[in-house]
From Swiss-Prot:
In the N-terminal section; belongs to the methyltransferase superfamily. tRNA (mnm(5)s(2)U34)-methyltransferase family. In the C-terminal section; belongs to the DAO family. The gene is mnmC. One of its GO terms (biological process) is tRNA wobble uridine modification. Coiled coil: none annotated. Residues 1-241 are annotated as: tRNA (mnm(5)s(2)U34)-methyltransferase. NCBIfam families: MnmC_Cterm, PRK01747.1-2, PRK01747.1-5, tRNA_MNMC2. Keywords: Cytoplasm, FAD, Flavoprotein, Methyltransferase, Multifunctional enzyme, Oxidoreductase, S-adenosyl-L-methionine, Transferase, tRNA processing. GO terms for molecular function: flavin adenine dinucleotide binding; oxidoreductase activity, acting on the CH-NH group of donors; tRNA (5-methylaminomethyl-2-thiouridylate)(34)-methyltransferase activity. This is tRNA 5-methylaminomethyl-2-thiouridine biosynthesis bifunctional protein MnmC. Its EC number is 2.1.1.61, 1.5.-.-. The lineage of its organism: Bacteria, Pseudomonadati, Pseudomonadota, Gammaproteobacteria, Pasteurellales.
Length: 667
């Protein structure tokens, strides 16, 4: 995990922030907000462009987030636009920014206090501001989406991959002056800018340096000068000419064109995966219908009384770590949002990971060294863990301070009820069978009635494999039983979740704890198992030890919840378009030789307008929010908040491509 370097700040005599890394001011000493309006908003003619915009989203990219002043100014202006023109087809603003040296929460707060007109926007940003690692972090401000790509910009830009080609409407070419920050003002930047910009898209920058002008012209931008802000003589503006060609797709086997019509969307599911897909689609104004085969939502794997939320990190896969940390931070942001909307039991009091054997101890210590962030993951001695837990423990282990637990069944049911007030239609006791794509819609029959929707999303766990379109996708079911136990005087002192070869939660308000969970692969039996019930308790006592608080636990009521999780061997979920296995086998079984000979490769053939999110296994509370946001972004053809290498690792055809790209066969 690449640790970020935070900005080193000082303030000059005008109280303007100065970067000690670059020995340059963050914005004009004259007036930072007015400079932002003049250089970037007027330089890109944003107000006029917004009035003439015919798409639902407008995308701005910026080459240095800094103090966030440009973002606050344009977000506030967009809110004014939406209020002035409520019937405009333009509904959403995306602001994509890059930042190598982020400010701290306190630094942002100290600077933003001088701009009371942005108080609400600033408070929302600072509440969620938690730069931890390189890559994209998405923040929500109602109709404004902020994506900050932390880390080295020239390393991040290629990660805005094929799906980002020709998506940016306007650039705020900011950052410190070219003579102070020469590595940013580089040919690579201009090339990526041109690739990412729509035909007719524009840029504006405060500088008029000749090498910047020549660099932008060399890649294809039309460039002109205008009067600079305040005492500055000139600045540059420009656009991507109408005759420009769209960039080629670099990874056609992981690419599929967006759906042309995406207003009417059906989701098959009823658990946490379908919940967050529905949420993100509704936020984009789509008509969404959920089809659930049960009499109530959250009856399957999302129906547990308590579940832990924390990033389950790897010690040997940096990409895995980046993905799960992104998911964890985004999930925390969404939970804060729902805390204000619906009631559900939860407590983010931390999660302890017990080093219950030598192998686990070595793994946890290695993760702690790699993350280098004690706010995220810290190695602790037994005495410190005992303090966090509130009960005695002899093992060393790790502590995740911001993690915790929530009630999945309460959360999912309450959140779905809230989404119904926002337009979600829920159809219960409905089994979708044999859907077929006919005349531009996915259609099926149920009890003699025909159902049809433009888009179909399958978020239905292990039941996914019952569809013919699931051919070749290596999902498998895992039975799990979670035991519910009444508290004891000793056990009720437990303050946070403890994980070992199982887990135990603190007491809920009903006086019960959860111990989980059994793990039986390729088993879909939903009956209570007395053996698994006893095994859950035995794991606690064997891995933690014979303490007063682990003894005297009463299992006699046989209270337990059974669920079937859907999993994959690589322990990474799947999200994206559902691939047509038979066709892709014809397309790519010889891809190793095609690429070696530098032959053309076709775009992947997927089932049209058919998508999935699955394989969340026991990590759904952490991963579902970001997976839902990514899938909704893909469906509506708007920026996806994840790097291209992680996106490729999540796609449903990844397991086949890994083999085909090595020249191996897929049966």
């Amino acid at each position: 995990m690449h640790k970020l370097t935070f900005a080193q700040l000082s303030f000059n005599s005008d109280n303007t922030p100065v970067s000690e890394q670059f020995d340059d001011i963050y914005f004009s000493t004259e007036d930072g907000v007015q400079e932002s309006y003049y250089v970037f908003q007027d330089g890109n003619q944003l107000w006029q462009k917004w009035q003439n915009h015919h798409r639902s989203a407008f995308v701005i990219a910026e080459t240095g987030f800094g103090t966030g002043l440009n973002f606050l100014a344009v977000a506030e202006k967009f809110q004014q636009f939406r209020s002035t023109f409520p019937d405009s087809p333009l509904k959403r603003l995306y602001f994509i920014s890059f930042e190598k040296y982020p400010l701290t929460q306190q630094q942002l707060a100290d600077i933003h206090q001088h701009y009371p007109q942005f108080t609400q926007l600033s408070a929302t940003l600072i509440a969620c501001w938690q730069p931890r690692q390189a890559g994209c972090q998405r923040y929500h401000f109602d109709d404004v989406y902020l994506d900050i790509w932390f880390g080295e910009m020239l390393e991040n830009l290629p990660q805005l991959g094929d799906l980002y080609n020709a998506t940016v409407d306007s650039w705020f070419l900011d950052g410190f002056s070219p003579d102070k920050n020469p590595t940013m003002w580089h040919e690579q930047l201009y090339q990526h800018m041109f690739r990412l910009t729509r035909v007719g898209g524009s840029f504006a920058t405060f500088t008029a340096a000749s090498h910047v002008r020549c660099g932008l012209q060399a890649v294809g931008f039309t460039v002109y000068k205008r009067k600079g802000f305040a005492k500055k003589r000139e600045m540059l503006c420009g656009e991507k000419a109408q005759k420009s060609q769209t960039a080629e797709v670099n990874f056609p086997y992981f690419y599929s064109p967006p759906a042309i019509v995406n207003d009417d969307i059906a989701i098959v599911g009823g658990g946490i995966a379908s919940l967050f897909v529905a949420l993100s689609l509704l936020e984009r104004g789509k008509q969404v219908t959920l089809y659930c085969q049960d009499s109530q939502v959250a009856q399957k794997a999302s129906g547990n009384a308590q579940g832990a939320i924390y990033p389950q990190l790897s010690d040997d896969d940096p990409r895995n770590v980046r993905f799960y940390v992104h998911c964890f931070d985004y999930a925390l942001q969404r939970l804060k949002q729902f805390e204000k909307l619906v009631p559900f039991e939860h407590a983010l009091t931390g999660v302890v990971l017990s080093a219950y054997n030598e192998k686990t101890a070595q793994k946890l210590q290695k993760i702690a060294r790699q993350t280098q962030n004690q706010d995220l993951f810290k190695w602790c001695q037994a005495e410190e863990l005992t303090e966090y837990l509130g009960v005695a423990i002899a093992n060393e282990g790790a502590f995740i301070p911001q993690a915790g637990w929530l009630s999945p069944v309460q959360f999912v049911q309450q959140a779905f009820a809230y989404l119904q007030t926002k337009g979600l239609k829920i159809v219960l006791n409905h089994t979708v069978t044999d859907p077929q794509f006919v005349e531009g819609k996915w259609q099926w029959q149920y009890q003699g009635v025909q159902f049809a929707h433009h888009i179909l999303v399958l978020a239905n766990g292990h039941s996914f494999t019952q569809f013919s379109q699931a051919e070749g996708i290596p999902l498998y079911p895992v039975r799990g039983q979670v035991s519910q136990i009444p508290t004891t005087p000793a056990l009720q002192k437990l303050k946070c979740v403890i994980c070992y070869d199982g887990y135990l939660t603190p007491m809920a308000t009903n006086g019960y704890h959860c111990i989980g969970a059994s793990h039986v692969r390729d088993n879909t039996d939903m009956a209570f198992s007395a053996i698994e019930h006893q095994q859950n308790l035995a794991k606690l006592q064997q891995n933690i030890g014979a303490y007063h608080w682990t003894q005297g636990i009463d299992l006699s009521a046989n209270l337990a919840k059974q669920g079937i999780r859907s999993a994959l061997r690589d322990r990474v979920p799947m999200v994206g378009p559902i691939p047509h296995f038979a066709v892709q086998k014809q397309q790519y079984s010889n891809i190793y030789n095609l690429l070696r000979r530098k032959k053309a490769v076709e775009n992947a053939v997927n089932f049209p307008h058919l998508y999935m999110v699955n394989g969340l296994a026991s990590r759904g509370l952490t991963t579902a929010p970001l997976l839902g946001e990514m899938l909704a972004s893909l469906i509506v053809n708007e920026p996806i908040p994840i790097s291209q290498d992680i996106w490729h690792a999540l796609l449903p055809n990844r397991t086949w491509l890994r083999k085909w790209l090595k020249g191996s066969k897929v049966v």
